[in-house]
C-alpha cells in the first residue's frame, strides 16, 4: 500500500513541478528545493547531470514503513517525469541521487 501511495504522489507532484520549473537539471533541482526545503539540514548538490538531495526527514521517525517503501516509490515516479534515474543513498540522513539520462 505504501508503494502505491508513493507512486501516485510522485507522479502527480512531479507533473506539477515539471509545469512549474521544467524537466531539465535546473527544473529537477528547483523542484526538489521547492518540495523538501522544510527538512531539517536540507541540502542539494548538483554535479553535472546529477542532483543529490539530503535532509533529516521526520517520516522515518513517525511512519517508518512508509519511509522504507513509499519514499523510494515516490522518488522513482518523481524521477521518471524528469527522465532521470534515482537511487537511495542513505536513510539517515534521507539522501537520494537523481541522474538525468
Predicted regions located by residue number:
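N-terminal accessory segment detector
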Residues: 1-50, 54-76, 82-91, 95-101
Amino acid at each position: 500500500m505504501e508503494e502505491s501511495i508513493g507512486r501516485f504522489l510522485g507522479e502527480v507532484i512531479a507533473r506539477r513541478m515539471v509545469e512549474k520549473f521544467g524537466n531539465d537539471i535546473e527544473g529537477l533541482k528547483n523542484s526538489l528545493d521547492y518540495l523538501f526545503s522544510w527538512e531539517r539540514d536540507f541540502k542539494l548538490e548538483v554535479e553535472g547531470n546529477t542532483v543529490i538531495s539530503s535532509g533529516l526527514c521526520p517520516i522515518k521517525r513517525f511512519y517508518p514503513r512508509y519511509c522504507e517503501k513509499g519514499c523510494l516509490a515516490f522518488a522513482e515516479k518523481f524521477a521518471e517525469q524528469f527522465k532521470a534515474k534515482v537511487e537511495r543513498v542513505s536513510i539517515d540522513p534521507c539522501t537520494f541521487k537523481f541522474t538525468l539520462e
